[in-house]
A protein has these predicted regions:
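Catalytic glycan-binding domains that act on GlcNAc-containing polysaccharides
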Residues: 36-203
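Hydrophobic membrane-insertion alpha-helices, especially the h-region
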Residues: 21-39
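N-terminal Lys/Arg-rich, disordered targeting/topogenic segments
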Residues: 1-17
């Protein structure tokens, strides 16, 4: 008789533990689903994950230089998270993380005689130069955004060398074949972010 009571009590303890585990699992599932749906809510994404400061400036230079404004926004997000004071350990400056020597060359190309390194922290100038440079890379790589973005990250010289070494054509789209992991990740990130900006900020 005592053995029967012990088995009953043991079964009850097991059932209580199972019920507790089920409740905890259900709670976690509900919290996860709630978080997922909140994160899918467009105003939340725009406010916290895909912010868009300097929207008018981006649009202005995108129109002037015939660049997809969503691409420019995605590059800025990846490069600086829209922080105009950003300065990398390599010396890249501002919203679009331009190297001073590249910016000086761009200034010469567009005839901006007022350029100096400090002025790269100015949002308008940085976005202007960065957008012009994106347009130049797209022209150089025949409109191929994968190659243009790889060049923006790793340098046009490296991309030209990869094309020669691997017989890549201007129709190249195999991001996995890019030798640098940082550049592979960068290209994927920017292309994915461009899609999100296009969805969240339809023109």
């Amino acid at each position: 008789m005592q053995g029967f009571r012990d088995r009953v009590q043991q079964n009850r303890r097991v059932q209580r533990r199972m019920a507790t585990c089920f409740c905890v699992a259900l709670f976690i599932l509900l919290v996860s689903l709630s978080a997922f749906f909140v994160l899918q809510f467009e105003p939340v994404q725009r406010k916290y994950f895909y912010v868009y400061p300097y929207h008018d400036t981006v649009m202005k230079y995108a129109e002037i230089y015939h660049v997809d404004s969503n691409l420019t926004a995605a590059v800025i997000k990846s490069e600086s998270k829209f922080k105009h004071t950003a300065l990398s350990h390599r010396g890249a400056v501002g919203l679009m993380q331009l190297m001073p020597e590249t910016a000086e060359w761009i200034a010469g190309q567009i005839g901006d005689k007022s350029y100096n390194v400090e002025s790269l922290h100015e949002p308008d100038r940085n976005i202007r130069y960065g957008t012009w440079y994106l347009a130049e890379l797209q022209r150089e790589f025949k409109g191929n955004d994968v190659l243009a973005l790889a060049a923006y990250n790793a340098g046009r010289g490296n991309v030209k060398a990869w094309m020669d070494e691997n017989n890549w054509s201007y129709s190249f789209h195999d991001i996995d074949a890019i030798p640098y992991k940082e550049t592979r990740d960068y290209v994927r990130q920017v292309i994915g972010d461009r899609k999100k900006y296009r969805e969240l900020y339809p023109e």
